[in-house]
Amino acid sequence: MTSLKIIFAGTPAFAAQHLQALLNSHHQVVAVYTQPDKPAGRGKKLQASPVKQLAEQHNIPVYQPKSLRKVEAQEEMRAIDADVMVVVAYGLILPQTVLAMPRLGCLNVHGSLLPRWRGAAPIQRAIWAGDKQTGITIMQMDEGLDTGDMLYKVYCDIAQDETSTSLYAKLMEIAPPALLHVLDGLDKGKFVSEKQDDIESCYAEKLSKEEAELNWHVSAEQLERHIRAFNPWPVSYFSTRDLQGNTQVIKVYKAAVLPHVDKVAGTILSADKNGIQIATAEGVLNLLQLQPAGKKPMDARDLLNGRAEWFPVGKVL
């Protein structure tokens, strides 16, 4: 079986898992590209990315250019003379000069069934939209944003209680083996690339903290999906005022949908050991696991034990 010389480009833990799979394979990782070290923690000390840490453990040369558009960075990469470049959540734009360097091109592992959910947050957007299925796509990169020709897909069902955390874990199970499968057949021409249909595409924009606020004027089903999509970050939330008039921001980690009632959206219908039930535009959202500021996530009953006055029945949030 042909052993390929690979440049790996990636930054977060998701990418490091793929690098580990390559290191465990018969292929040869000859260089690693990752984002420059960034300040982290209270001390703002420079911290290496998970990919860099793993590469250094295996004595693989690490390159951290701020940009790949400069001639110096491109010539440095050209000298490595790799067969293929594997890109997983790298974070830098690859110009055409770089894309054309390896003889087998640049492969990208993307966390959706392209062309659906191109962009930075495919896992979260798929859950929020109510998709029943997602997966991973391995593609040949071009200069567009996740627009390259597709080589291989693996499908994955989205469970009714799926969170971004659990779906991420599912995709992490299927993605590295799929990457190795493609690499093993790439040099033999086993994979016929398929162009993406732009008409079928949609964009998975990066999540923002502003989007995390719950809007009671949409359906309970949409809100429940919102909560699962925004778990573990940035976490869905709503605000209420305490008896002193202070605003209390409450994060929500888990909720359930109940049948419709004819009440103004945002009205607290009940607050007891079974949850905090809020009327929405369609249906009732039963809040089950919440987190007030400065506390750990807790069941609704535990929050009500200490803060029942925040949730009087009939109050409109």
Curated annotation (Swiss-Prot):
Pfam family, one: Formyl_trans_N
Listed GO CC annotations: cytosol
Entry EC no(s): 2.1.2.9
Keywords, comma-separated and alphabetical: Protein biosynthesis, Transferase
Amino acids binding (6S)-5,6,7,8-tetrahydrofolate: 112-115
InterPro entries the UniProt entry points to: Fmt, Formyl_trans_C, Formyl_trans_C_sf, Formyl_transf_N, Formyl_transf_N_sf, Formyl_transferase-like_C_sf, GART_AS, Met-tRNA-FMT_C
SUPFAM superfamilies registered for this protein in UniProt: FMT C-terminal domain-like, Formyltransferase
Keyword Protein biosynthesis: yes
The organism's place on the tree of life at top rank: Bacteria
Primary enzyme class: transferase
GO MF, any single term: methionyl-tRNA formyltransferase activity
The reaction(s) this protein catalyses: L-methionyl-tRNA(fMet) + (6R)-10-formyltetrahydrofolate = N-formyl-L-methionyl-tRNA(fMet) + (6S)-5,6,7,8-tetrahydrofolate + H(+)
Protein's job: Attaches a formyl group to the free amino group of methionyl-tRNA(fMet). The formyl group appears to play a dual role in the initiator identity of N-formylmethionyl-tRNA by promoting its recognition by IF2 and preventing the misappropriation of this tRNA by the elongation apparatus.
Family annotation (NCBIfam families): fmt
Family in the record: Belongs to the Fmt family.
Name of the protein: Methionyl-tRNA formyltransferase
Native source organism of the sequence: Pasteurella multocida (strain Pm70)
Gene, per the UniProt record: fmt
